[in-house]
Amino acid sequence: MNFSGRARPTHPVRHARPPALRRGTEQASLVRALDGYVGDLSALRLSADLPDALRDPAVEALVAARGARDVAARVARAVDGLDTALDRAHDIGQGLTPSPAAAATLARMYDRRDRLLAALREGLAQVQDVHTTLLELSARLELYGAGTAGAEVGAVGHRLDVLRQAFGQLEVAAAR
């Protein structure tokens, strides 16, 4: 019982899961690609073969990629929403010329959709860059030792900053 005298529910509170992304869309494909990079970065971080000099950068890359994936999924759902709205507008107005105001609204939605998808593509490219850089450094350090790649290990931090910035800007753009 709580202070109001009512019994508390015995079932746990369930948080609604976000809706699934529309199948067969570019945005769903981009999020799936990010899932692949997150999975591989997780495996890389746990790899016994990962040189010690890359342990911290690998953890940071994984955390950044997971955060990027979360932002990308929210943005992809926003693109799905725009796709749904555009589909409905076209289905209802089929064969009719839109009014100037409706045409302007449709143009804004298409423009926003295009900008969000371009930002998703760029964000994925940033994750790819960090991932491949870590793989390259891991191979190089395995072959030549830690003394040869100090500056390059530091450059991973810079790439991570660029990645975080790209997804921070994407999140702001999606909120507009």
Where in this protein do the model-derived segments appear?
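Hydrophobic alpha-helical membrane segments, chiefly transmembrane helices and signal peptide h-regions
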Residues: M1-N2
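Membrane-proximal, non-transmembrane interface segments of integral membrane proteins
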Residues: G5-A103
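Soluble C-terminal extramembrane regulatory/interaction domains of multi-pass membrane proteins
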Residues: G81-R176
